[in-house]
Amino acid sequence: MKAGSIADRAPAARTGSSKNGGHKTPAPRAEAIIDPATPVSNGVTGTVERPAMTAHYIRSRIGKICVAITGPTPADMMRNAEQIIRENHFVEFRLDYLPNPLAIIPKIKTFLYERGEVTAIATCRRAATGGKFRGAIAAELEVLEKAALAGCHMIDVELQTAEHMKPAQMQRLRSRGAALIVSYHDFEATRDLDKIFERIRPFQPEFMKIVSTAKNLTDNITMMRFLERCRDEAELIGITMGEQGTISRVLGLRAGSVFTFASAHAGEETGPGQIEARTLREAWRIDQIDLSTKVYGVVGNPVKHSLSPLMQNIAFRRETVNAVFLPLQTTKLHDLLTLVKEIPLHGLAVTMPFKTEIIKHLEKTDALSQKIGACNTVVRAQDGKLYGFNTDVAAVVRPLERRLQLKGTKILVLGAGGAARAAVFGLVEKGAEVFIWNRTPDAAKKLARQAKAKTIRKEQLAKSTFDVIVNTTPVGMRGVKPASILEPKEINARLVFDLVYNPIDTPLIRMAREKGLPVITGVEMFVHQGARQFEIWTGKPAPEEEMLRVVVHALRQQSAEKTDKS
């Protein structure tokens, strides 16, 4: 393996003679002399045969994203296909999602005949290998054979199926003209990828698809190094699934994956962690990612519902910055630090629970981060060293300063984590009298001592009044339980500020409004601190109004979708 980070290892041209990683390259298939889509009658057997479509021919037709098409009935699946091809001409028909896959074959034949610009994969994955098809191998092969004859350009055969096929079955399937993808899916972990490669090699498919599950962030590194090692020896599609596998879905292309898979819409994923095609193309600009693209991310647990990737990617696009921003969910900081070095990452937005822990791994932090002991922004300098900043303090203090005089105000801060430290130190600095309540009293007492604040017990809240209540905990965040950190009787203040931004109307915000209290939602703080992060990373003024617009739009859209489902 070549030295250096993944981004440093430029792709090499496929020569057909590479021996990287100990793999030998099979002889390349001869290019079809006639149009690969033209059927040929076998005068001896009377069967219809077509020359197999070559990888070169397929690559000349496709883009970087293959959109998976699903549907409970043939009519639904074809209706979805009609919608998808308006923006995406490379699709996968997931035939295993249908109770009777053979019923859709005539419709696919007509569809592809009338739309020559569309390139299609046919997949009928059996339940035993992670799909939904309940039939036997022979039934699966019948579906794929007829899909190939109907005009599908590629057929996906799971490795376990290929290993059970007789030579005559494979020869018959290959004679139907479609390029062969032999695929392997590991829904549990990322194991020996080279071993899987060697199992697939004897079948000499036009494409190899190897998919694993990321149990941590560094599993993405394992997959991308594998792609780099073997990209000169085969046409590879490599992906890690799961919430922690997003990196491979976005950056795997520059490591050597021929294309990646995407869902047509949110909620229609055919694999764990699959991303909506429009998000990949418009927000993350996957078609423009190259070896010079800088990589940033939001790290924490959880970050599944974070809108930081949307907000920052839109800002990068608006200011023509060649960069991409990814969600990096992890429970272990050393997992992240390995990723920072290997990709390499150029900057981080740090969220719970790492705002304090990350400081000891940085070369230097700004005075504010040192003072409060929490850092939410990391930038990688040209020398590779990591430097930390805090943009949370200003993002908490400024919205409050716009509404009231902080000096002498009585403020209740809920929580004692990194965001709480920013709020408490920032508010004390402005002359406020700050009280801290946390479910773990010792953490509250420690923060109070350090910041010259006070603590308060839970039973005192209902009898106490404050000028402001500030929630710095994740309670109320989408996907986090319990729903509210306070009961209505404990909300006794002139103003309520919830740092949780997703959803906009958290349970705490709703209860405050029901009591007639003015509120500050977390969106204001979220966008403000994100804008400052953008400026630290890029040295350019942040398009703050545009960032606010896309965040509010996304949150309202999520709220509307949730209402429609309820």
Residue ranges and their predicted role:
Residues L499-S566:
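Adenosine-phosphate binding glycine-rich loop
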Residues Y296-V303, L400, L404, T409-V428, ...:
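Glycine-rich adenosine-cofactor-binding loop
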Residues R59-I84, N88-S175, I181-T190:
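Active-site beta->alpha loop and helix N-cap motifs at the rims of alpha/beta catalytic domains
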Residues T293-L404, P503:
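Phosphate/diphosphate ligand-binding glycine-rich loop within oxidoreductases
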Residues K430-A451:
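NAD(P)-binding Rossmann-fold cofactor-contacting core
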Residues R449-V519, E524:
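Rossmann-like adenosine-cofactor binding region
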Residues K2, N42-M77, R285-T293:
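N-terminal amphipathic alpha-helix/helix-capping segment at the start of soluble metabolic enzymes
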Residues Q160-S292:
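Catalytic alpha/beta core domains of metabolic enzymes, predominantly
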